[in-house]
Amino acid sequence: MPEIRQLSEGIFEVTKDKKQLSTLNLDPGKVVYGEKLISVEGDEYRTWDPRRSKLGAMVLKKFDIPLKRNSKVLYLGAASGTTVSHVSDIVSEGAVYSVEFAPRSMRDFIGLASRRKNIFPILADAGKPDSYAHIVEPVDVIFQDVAQPNQAEIAARNAVRFLKKDGYLLLSIKARSIDTAASPKEIFKEEVKKLEQAFEPGFEVLTARELMPYHEDHLGVMARLKK
């Protein structure tokens, strides 16, 4: 019998031969990206590969993930939905507003969204939040995984527009999308400084950790707007 350990609300460690990060499948019997399904006492868990998910890596790097069953989430950089599907599992009674700029990725993503009533796909540029302001309500959490040079600016624009006063920003900073020559550590230091000082009202950075060994040259950041 597999062993289940809850790491935080909606996030589990399932041990069957080995420990595997998992979420409770909101769409039983269906897989999204080739993950394993594990049944335990009538519940079905989907394994969550941290090497294919920045948020999954942040869980294993001991971030205090603030997602709840009824959370409203704005996900920037949805791609084809690998991580969005796990967020959908976690916020089973909430909503995941999922922004993706690439039409090809969105075509793949639409199939996933059609099976999960809490996913709302939005084909848009995450750098232009006003273009989807008529769709997105105030959210509890913003998760951002976009490979653009102005990652901090995009996060700030969306947080000011949509994040509740007591909400949280979870951000994956990809150093090589900002500067291919500079030291990743220097890039991370500068991007955190931008979050804290370059935008009004600015962010209070709560946690910042590199996502190795799961993702090279990536920094995970958890922050909230300054009060």
From Swiss-Prot:
GO terms for biological process: box C/D sno(s)RNA 3'-end processing; tRNA processing. PROSITE patterns: FIBRILLARIN. It holds the Pfam family Fibrillarin. Its EC number is 2.1.1.-. SMART domains: Fibrillarin (SM01206). S-adenosyl-L-methionine binds at residues 82-83, 100-101, 125-126, 145-148. It comes from the Archaea. GO terms for molecular function: histone H2AQ104 methyltransferase activity; RNA binding; rRNA methyltransferase activity. SUPFAM superfamilies: S-adenosyl-L-methionine-dependent methyltransferases (SSF53335). The keyword RNA-binding applies. Disulfide bonds: none annotated. InterPro entries: Fibrillarin, Fibrillarin_CS, SAM-dependent_MTases_sf. Keywords: Methyltransferase, RNA-binding, rRNA processing, Transferase, tRNA processing. HAMAP family: RNA_methyltransf_FlpA. Interacts with nop5. Component of box C/D small ribonucleoprotein (sRNP) particles that contain rpl7ae, FlpA and nop5, plus a guide RNA. Involved in pre-rRNA and tRNA processing. Utilizes the methyl donor S-adenosyl-L-methionine to catalyze the site-specific 2'-hydroxyl methylation of ribose moieties in rRNA and tRNA. Site specificity is provided by a guide RNA that base pairs with the substrate. Methylation occurs at a characteristic distance from the sequence involved in base pairing with the guide RNA. Belongs to the methyltransferase superfamily. Fibrillarin family. This is Fibrillarin-like rRNA/tRNA 2'-O-methyltransferase. The lineage of its organism: Archaea, Methanobacteriati, Methanobacteriota, Stenosarchaea group, Methanomicrobia. The gene is flpA.
